[in-house]
């Protein structure tokens, strides 16, 4: 029987999830400095779990340590984006292929839930919708390790999506819905080649 999580572990995970969400949604902007004392005051929690959470964020490549200065949200580096996009493409295509080979009829039918985007014009809602669609496919690929890695990469794309949309002259988000419908249509039709091609 597994023991219950220690309070410090729970606090660390709570802080980690909060800061991770703020980074991925660009509420903490690329290049923004983070100080332990400021986070202690803002989150109302002791320094130890905050330090643990910051260490985990550094390990995930979301922040960097600046000796004697504190922590900084990592900048979005063009070469890093290119590498991440290539990795995501490989992972998502494999997830689609495996899902089409192994998923039940019910799992495939539930893809239709993503055919219509949320009515809210709120950007975070749309980003949640986009992430939920892609992580659903990953979660049902039948390979737990692949799913875990793919979902982490997909979630890290949230802030890239946020930056690309908000910096574009065209703020239309209809492309998410259109792309999802095309992928869903190909999967439901059993056209693996087309579904994989659309993932790119």
Language model features with spans:
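C-terminal all-alpha effector/ligand-binding and dimerization domain
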Residues: 7, 164-200
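Short linear motifs at protein or domain termini
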Residues: 1-101
